[in-house]
């Protein structure tokens, strides 16, 4: 019976697929064994990617309704690229919202209503000839991803309709195809019933954004296959069961031959059978199979050969498989008999230029970056990914939570409050078919990937009977995997939906409370460590739970990549834009930028902490040797080389490499083989220990460091006193105090109340005098907990102070000048800054904060520092500090004490909104030099200090919402701090920095540093 399209389907919850073919596995198939072994692009597929003709309408009423008719000429239309988003190719505009629906405030709607006047329509046309090898064969079309709903016509005839943006939609074109030119028409709507189910935290696009291709099938064809590669209870026998659904042009006998090859190409098992049915199951077993895990992703290759009744080979299907067993044992998730810990990250499919159109190269870069930084798991937040992603996870080794395309966040949570009065799907069983369709489509496509350990019922959609039934479906069709859903946290009546306790952004204490109160399920954080801007502070508090509580089984950082889009400012310069930058309203602004890599895929400084805390092998050195703790479940350390290095005051003394063997789940203490000489000098020693790859791997080259540990110790006392010799001349002017030595002069101003000149060899170093600084440019997390509101008085105190006293003391060998400052915020806050000038031209600076009386009434300090400016020519930095990447009090676990160089402009991290960045803790020395290697050196004296050196002041950064708003660079701004508060990261909407990383206003603070000329 012929079906006619109807635009009313867009708002009909009962219509989500018309004439769409049943979902099936994502296997490939070939005509010969030789092809199947090489797996080239399939000859029975023909890509329709590329330029299509295109028309854009702002709503259905203005679309060209009859464009699909053969007599309607579309060849003069514009071109658009497929795959691609409409909004990134010059039509409409991208919009970013998090939880609210994109029409909020413009239309008052309830499901399944959609806006009538704001529903952009993209009309696509592709003219094609059927490839010769597909002529006289069945012809099908596959759309791998179309957002959010679309209609298809071929040669004027209606073909079908589909919703669900993130799983394939396939249709039979055979009845409509003709010889010669065919006219394929696709009408894509941005809003549909499906829009209510796709309220994920991402940019709202529309269009054909994944591959489109034609395909044909042979006379005997594996339409669907379900490969179950399991293990028996002893884990010693692999049980391979493959269920096939066949398509046959004639109901004649089929011979199926199955051959299983190991990774070296040897046949390890075979089976064959004959069948007259459309369903068949082929079984075989393997003794002592190599097992699949993220540590060692061993894949076998199954070849299925289909012969017709004459014995002619018709089709060959290659399929990679991994033997593994994933299950709950005594309320603990185990893989191949071992307790697993997910060291994971959430990943949106994203490219800063093309949005959710990602290439294989993008995927490879992501997976290699993850592996290099010890990430072992990924959650496909919050929709099924491009099919190729799972193949790469199988091959490279990543554990996957595969999440169905469901999020209805705006239907139950408003402004952070749980209010589910009109939540969908909830218990509204009329929504079950459209929701279940998404679950079925994901399962059927992805079911054969060993990397997928867990099915997820979606994200942030509250809970109810519908989602519970989705969970029951997954369990009924696939007992080899577990089921995840976090939303039951808000509705415990549906707790059975999830096999694990899953929470978002729970504090470490809350997690411990769960784990110490008779837990019934293992715990994972499906989202934690909200990595928005300068964040990820305190991550160690979560990873420390891994060995403390067996039922704590890890978590997934939010998230992998900044969802920021390249845009040009008014002068044509590119920058990464966020919500609102395209005139999109409503919007959630920069909340889209939460990545541990930037939108250009370069790792952010936060990745330094991730790599260290996610190490599977821990190196714990002391002065005599190193404890190697191999926390891998299945692999020993034979693939790595141990390297250890001894440094004295940052200078390398000794280095050695050796092989090391530590079995999985074991630890070994290895003594160092040091040379005796050079180890008794007074000073600071640092031992670095590293494990590096012996050979190239798929994901990294030989020499890549997989694990690191360090030990710092001191020999002898710290040299605090200066013994510089020479004469100093002191000039007491009416306004200034001048101190002069050989080839240098220092000037202190009574009027300014500070050091105003430091003149070395005819060059002025001070462009702006040092002043107390209490403020840092607010980070995204600071903004989330209203730091400017609560602690804004320190912003004011940093801009205005009063020098109430100046004292000068002349002694043999040095001259001291002490300034005392008061602040309008409180008459009980006092800061003293003392400068001691020595005959060699060096200065010792001591800064003291006192507020012991009355300080308890003041808010916490963002930092306690001195800030001054040098000329911008001093832009070369040489550090001996914790690094090499930026680090903070609560994000320094992964930093190492080392020497490194960078430029001032590079110290500013590339967060999409300017904010505090570039800090280094544990600073011993930092040289600030010009191109000739001249300048100053800032050195700690009693305790290591913190330094942040930037082209901009905290206040310039504070006032800018985008990098292009920052002024031209005129100075090098030096902030030397005794302490700065941590950056936090439990969440970005109110979670405070943990207490031990906060600067309380009622504590006395002091730091000391030297300024030396270079």
Swiss-Prot record:
SUPFAM superfamilies: (Trans)glycosidases, beta-Galactosidase/glucuronidase domain, Galactose mutarotase-like, Galactose-binding domain-like
Alphabetically ordered keywords of this record: Glycosidase, Hydrolase
Pfam families given in the database record: Bgal_small_N, Glyco_hydro_2, Glyco_hydro_2_C, Glyco_hydro_2_N, LacZ_4
Entry EC no(s): 3.2.1.23
Hydrolase in keyword set: yes
Family matches, as PROSITE patterns: GLYCOSYL_HYDROL_F2_1, GLYCOSYL_HYDROL_F2_2
GO molecular function: beta-galactosidase activity; carbohydrate binding
Domain of life: Bacteria
Catalytic activity: Hydrolysis of terminal non-reducing beta-D-galactose residues in beta-D-galactosides
Protein name (Swiss-Prot/TrEMBL): Beta-galactosidase
Organism, as annotated: Halalkalibacterium halodurans (strain ATCC BAA-125 / DSM 18197 / FERM 7344 / JCM 9153 / C-125) (Bacillus halodurans)
């Amino acid at each position: 019976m012929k079906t006619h399209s109807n635009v009313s389907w867009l708002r009909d919850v009962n219509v989500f697929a018309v004439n769409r073919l049943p979902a099936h596995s994502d296997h490939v198939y070939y005509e010969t064994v030789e092809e199947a072994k090489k797996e080239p692009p399939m000859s029975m597929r023909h890509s329709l990617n590329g330029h299509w003709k295109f028309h854009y309408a702002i709503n259905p009423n203005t679309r060209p309704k009859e464009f699909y008719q053969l007599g309607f000429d579309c060849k003069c239309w514009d071109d658009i690229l497929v795959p691609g988003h409409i909004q990134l190719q010059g039509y409409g505009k991208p919009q970013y919202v998090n939880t609210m629906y994109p029409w909020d405030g413009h239309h008052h709607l309830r499901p399944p209503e959609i806006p009538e006047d704001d529903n952009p329509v993209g009309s696509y046309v592709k003219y094609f000839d059927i490839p010769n090898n597909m002529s006289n064969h069945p012809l099908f079309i596959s759309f791998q991803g179309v957002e959010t709903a679309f209609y298809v016509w071929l040669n004027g005839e209606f073909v079908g309709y589909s919703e669900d943006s993130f799983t394939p939609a396939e249709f039979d074109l055979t009845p409509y195809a003709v010889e010669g030119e065919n006219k394929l028409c696709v009408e894509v709507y941005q809003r549909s019933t499906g829009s209510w189910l796709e309220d994920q935290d991402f940019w709202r696009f529309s269009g054909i954004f994944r591959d489109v291709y034609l395909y044909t099938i042979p006379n005997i064809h594996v339409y669907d296959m379900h490969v179950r590669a399991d293990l028996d209870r002893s884990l010693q026998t692999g049980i391979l069961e493959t269920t096939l659904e066949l398509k046959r042009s004639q109901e004649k006998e089929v011979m199926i031959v199955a051959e299983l090859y190991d990774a070296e190409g040897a046949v390890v098992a075979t089976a064959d059978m004959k069948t007259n049915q459309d369903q068949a199951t082929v079984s075989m077993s393997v003794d002592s199979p190599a097992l699949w895990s993220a540590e060692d992703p061993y894949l076998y290759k199954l070849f299925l050969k289909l012969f017709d009744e004459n014995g002619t080979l018709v089709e060959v299907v290659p399929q990679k498989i991994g033997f593994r067993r994933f299950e709950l044992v005594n309320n603990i998730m185990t893989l191949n008999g071992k307790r697993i810990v997910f060291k994971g990250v959430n990943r949106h499919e994203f490219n800063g230029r093309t949005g959710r159109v990602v290439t294989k190269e993008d995927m490879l870069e992501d997976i290699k970056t993850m592996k290099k930084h010890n990430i072992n798991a990924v959650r496909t937040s919050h929709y099924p990914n491009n099919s190729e992603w799972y193949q790469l996870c199988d091959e490279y080794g990543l554990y996957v939570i595969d999440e169905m395309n469901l999020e209805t966040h705006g239907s139950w949570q408003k402004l952070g409050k749980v209010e589910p009065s009109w939540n969908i799907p909830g218990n509204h069983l009329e929504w079950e078919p459209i929701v279940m369709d998404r679950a079925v489509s994901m399962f059927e496509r992805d079911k054969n990937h060993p990397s997928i350990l867990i099915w997820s019922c979606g994200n942030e959609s509250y809970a109810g009977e519908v989602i519970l039934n989705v969970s029951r479906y997954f369990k009924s069709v696939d007992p080899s995997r577990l089921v995840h859903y976090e939303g039951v946290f808000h509705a415990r009546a549906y707790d059975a939906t999830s096999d694990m306790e899953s929470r978002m952004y729970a504090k470490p204490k809350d997690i411990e409370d769960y784990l110490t109160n008779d837990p019934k399920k293992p715990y994972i954080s499906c989202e934690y460590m909200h990595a928005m801007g300068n964040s990820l502070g305190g991550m160690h508090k979560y990873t420390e739970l891994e060995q403390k509580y067996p039922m704590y089984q890890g978590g997934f950082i939010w998230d992998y990549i900044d969802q920021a889009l390249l845009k040009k400012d008014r002068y044509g310069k590119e920058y990464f834009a966020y919500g609102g930058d395209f005139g999109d309203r409503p919007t959630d602004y920069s909340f889209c930028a939460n990545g541990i890599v930037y939108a250009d895929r370069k790792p952010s400084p936060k990745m330094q902490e991730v790599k260290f805390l996610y190490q599977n092998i821990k190196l714990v050195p002391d002065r005599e040797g190193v404890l190697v703790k191999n926390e891998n479940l299945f692999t020993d350390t034979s693939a790595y080389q141990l390297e250890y290095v001894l440094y004295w005051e940052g200078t390398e003394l000794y280095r050695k490499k050796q092989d090391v063997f530590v079995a999985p789940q074991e630890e070994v203490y290895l003594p160092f083989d040091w040379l005796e000489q050079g180890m008794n000098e007074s000073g600071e020693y640092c031992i670095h220990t590293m494990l590096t790859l012996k050979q190239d791997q798929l994901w990294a080259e030989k020499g890549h460091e997989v694990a690191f540990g360090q030990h710092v110790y001191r020999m002898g006392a710290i040299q605090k006193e200066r013994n510089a010799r020479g004469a100093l001349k002191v000039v007491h002017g009416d306004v200034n105090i001048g101190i002069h030595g050989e080839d240098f002069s220092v000037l202190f101003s009574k009027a300014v109340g500070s050091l105003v000149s430091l003149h070395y060899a005819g060059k002025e170093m001070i462009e702006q005098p040092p002043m107390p600084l209490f403020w840092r440019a607010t980070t995204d997390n600071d903004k989330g907990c209203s730091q400017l509101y609560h602690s804004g008085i320190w912003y004011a105190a940093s801009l205005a102070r009063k020098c109430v006293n100046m004292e000068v003391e002349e002694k043999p060998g040095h001259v001291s000048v002490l300034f005392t400052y008061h602040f309008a915020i409180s008459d009980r806050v006092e800061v003293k800054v003392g400068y001691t000038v020595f005959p060699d031209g060096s200065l010792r600076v001591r800064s003291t904060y006192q507020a012991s009386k009355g300080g308890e009434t003041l808010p916490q300090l963002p930092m306690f520092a001195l800030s001054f400016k040098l000329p911008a020519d001093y832009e070369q930095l040489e550090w001996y500090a914790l690094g090499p990447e930026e680090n903070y009090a609560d994000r320094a676990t992964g930093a190492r004490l080392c020497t490194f160089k960078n430029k001032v402009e590079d110290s500013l991290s590339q967060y999409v909104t300017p904010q505090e960045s570039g800090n280094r803790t544990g600073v011993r020395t930092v040289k600030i030099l010009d191109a000739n290697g001249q300048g100053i050196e800032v050195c700690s004296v009693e305790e290591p200090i913190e330094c942040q050196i930037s082209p901009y002041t905290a206040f310039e950064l504070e006032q800018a919402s985008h990098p292009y708003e920052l002024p031209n660079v005129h100075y090098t701004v030096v902030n030397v701090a005794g302490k700065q508060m941590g950056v936090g990261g439990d969440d970005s909407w109110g979670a405070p920095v943990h207490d031990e990383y906060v600067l309380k206003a009622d504590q006395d603070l002091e730091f000391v540093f030297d300024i030396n000329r270079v």
